[in-house]
Amino acid sequence: MAAILYIVGSFIPLYLFSDFLQIHIDEIPAFIASFAYGPLMGVVVLVVKTLLKLPFTKTLCVGELADLLYSLVFVIPAAIIYKKNRKFKSAIIGFVVGFVLQIVVSFFFNIFVMIPFYGSIFELPQAFLDAKWTFALSAILPFNVIKNLIVIAITLPTYKSLHRLIDKI
């Protein structure tokens, strides 16, 4: 699963937002692994994917580690909820919980950690740093909502079509 995750980890830019905001569909294999084999497998897949990406980073490793955090917050709650009751309704509830948690964590982590960090490293203008709440509300928040909806929309039918095959393995 980690190898698949690395391969599908291509970026899909949404040109409405900043160029560093790119959709990573690499959460899909992590969801499939965690739904099939439990939350720990989802964690393993995400960590391996991150380790594979670190040597090629352009973000001083910080972007990849933040992406790992956001992905873990999205995948783990969904996997835990689904593991307790392996029904479609549980998957939906898990996706909603993970969705909301990921949005909240990524929003505040960007405001209090990522933007100030990159501001100091790349000497961003003070006006940008002063407008971090506006930037987070107008770019980061809508981007993550769109990204999460795309990931869920692809994961649900993919897992539904694969779960019988996975159960036989």
Region annotations inferred by a language model:
Residues M1-I169:
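Loop-helix junctions at membrane interfaces
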